[in-house]
Regions:
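N-terminal signal peptide c-region/cleavage motif recognized by signal peptidases
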Residues: 11-13
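Sec-dependent signal peptide recognition
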Residues: 1-8
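Noncatalytic, solvent-exposed loop/strand surfaces
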Residues: 15-247
Length: 247
């Protein structure tokens, strides 16, 4: 069991900038907050609160006074004896458990809502620890993608499931060796998600309804990269890095 902790930094009276998705507001890992005390020797940060959490690799997102985080709830897994010459880093196993999404109050860690669902893992077992992707918060919605392809859209206010899909099952694609790890992104009314397979390496869904809008590209394996959108020569371009190509 890990602890999720929030540290208090000495910041001016204005509220700190939100961090609503993977790599922050600009998806570039840049924190643009001003007047932040960074001399931790002179003025070290102090812990404000902590709450128990399950296992996982996903970072928290922060938006509108709330913290959104994913984790995994499962009993410890004990592997059987490996065959001679087997590399433990490539041995798959079916491991029962649940994935969970929680919303906490930013000021004190109070759990405002949570949702869990069955998610048996089938990736290589030493890394079958938990979700990889940070929740994405956008215009009152929270989007999460689990390690086995469970894609959910929640109401940020009360945690109601607005829509859900299992992208690996629907697009008939085997769970990547180290789990689904590419983060979805929002562009206008679209939620763009890396998937994998023939014609569905990347899929765009209506972010409000979850309906497929388009799909593109072929890849033998999904890869673990996160799509990026940049304006190049005046045009919005989607960059997708799969297991074989940069598209």
């Amino acid at each position: 069991m890990r602890l999720l902790s929030i540290l208090l930094f000495m910041i001016a009276s204005s509220p700190a900038e939100d961090w609503p998705q993977y790599l922050g507001p600009g998806r570039d890992a840049v924190w643009r907050e001003q007047k932040v005390e960074l001399d931790f020797v002179k003025r070290p940060p102090r812990q404000v609160w902590s709450v128990p959490a399950g296992s996982g690799y996903a970072g928290p997102s922060v938006a509108d006074g709330r913290v959104f985080v994913m984790d995994r709830l499962a009993k410890p897994y004990r592997a059987g004896k490996l065959k001679p010459g087997s590399n433990v880093n490539f041995v798959r196993a079916r491991i029962p458990g649940k994935e969970r999404v929680r919303c906490l109050r930013e000021t004190n860690g109070e759990v405002l809502w949570e949702h869990s669902y069955e998610a048996d893992y089938s990736s290589v077992y030493p890394y079958a620890i938990g979700p990889r992707t940070t929740p994405l918060v956008y215009k009152g919605m929270v989007y999460t993608l689990g390690a086995e392809g469970h894609l959910h859209a929640y109401s940020a206010e009360d945690g109601k499931v607005v829509w859900q899909r299992n992208i690996l099952k629907e697009y008939e694609f085997e769970t990547p060796l180290w789990g689904t790890a590419g983060h979805p992104l929002v562009e206008g009314d679209l939620l763009i998600c890396p998937v994998g397979g023939e014609g569905s390496t990347v899929v765009a869904f209506d972010r409000r309804s979850g309906k497929e809008k388009w799909k593109a590209l072929n890849a033998r394996e999904a890869g673990y990269g996160t799509p990026v959108i940049e304006t190049v020569n005046g045009h919005r371009q989607l960059l997708v890095w799969d297991a074989e190509n940069l598209n």
